[in-house]
């Protein structure tokens, strides 16, 4: 499976937003773009550049490459409702994202690895595709041989209950989670403007 293999910290500095827990700590120390002129004043940003930056934020935040991201957009357009809202809701339903939201991994990259290595079951069936779309009522749990892994236990212990969203019910003791409902856009607090992404793709 193709995925981004560069430095997410450098990308975070370039975009001016933390795209991972590690990048968040780094940005606190170096809140400017990388490179020789990173601390210099930036000129006026064009409308296209703003739209492109928002798309990059979403892609890197969720770990999605261009082809798949564009497919999400096409699917969002075909659905009823606001295209931007549809786009966010689709991406939030990804299994790797739900695993991260549930606190089973400290980052989406870590969650993606758990899924890819076949550690998880959805409704009792093994699923190793990070982009698998979870539906309301789905039960996500670890395979018997994968339960109580140190990395997962540590992540759950570190994840505050306040971080776990209302649309996911987590049983920490048994390392299970139920996807209760598709979240509304207003409930998703992420540093991007999906409407600018829609404007970019609709040109």
Curated annotation (Swiss-Prot):
Assigned keywords, A-Z: Ribonucleoprotein, Ribosomal protein, RNA-binding, rRNA-binding
The keyword rRNA-binding belongs to this UniProt entry's keyword annotation: yes
Coiled-coil region list: none
Cellular component per GO, a single term: small ribosomal subunit
Pfam family of the protein (one): S4
Ranges where the S4 RNA-binding domain occurs: 93-154
Ribonucleoprotein as UniProt keyword: yes
CDD domains: S4 (cd00165)
Family according to the record: Belongs to the universal ribosomal protein uS4 family.
Function: One of the primary rRNA binding proteins, it binds directly to 16S rRNA where it nucleates assembly of the body of the 30S subunit.
Assembly mode: Part of the 30S ribosomal subunit. Contacts protein S5. The interaction surface between S4 and S5 is involved in control of translational fidelity.
NCBIfam families, A to Z: PRK05327.1, rpsD_bact
Protein name, entry field: Small ribosomal subunit protein uS4
Gene that encodes the chain: rpsD
